[in-house]
C-alpha cells in the first residue's frame, strides 16, 4: 500500500472504532503498545494490558487466569510463536472492528473497551482474548 492509501485505511479503521466501540484515541495507542510488547516478548507488559479474570486454554483445558503474575508465568503457553507473529505483524489499517472489539488476524487476539462506570464514560482498553485463530 502506498502511504496515502495506508493513511486512508487507518482512518477508516479509526472511524469504525468510533462508530462501534468509542474514542479511537484510546484504542490506537493500546493496540500499538500491545503489538510492541508482544514483539519484544515482554510478558509483564502484555500481562498489564489484559483484563482479568482472563480465559485461556492451557494444555487443552479452559483455565481462568486471575492476575498479571499468573498470566506472565503462563505467557509462552498463551502467546505461542504463531500467535505472537500474527499480533506483531498486524497492519493497523487491516484490523477488523466489531461489537466484540478489535480483532487481530483471524481472531488470534482481541482488544476491547471495558466500562468502569454505569454510564460507560470511563473505559479501559484491554486485551480480552488471545487464542488460536479461526484459520488454525
Where are these regions (language model features)?
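Charged, alpha-helical scaffolding/interaction elements associated with membrane systems
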Residues: 39-40
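C-terminal-biased regions
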Residues: 4-36, 47-136
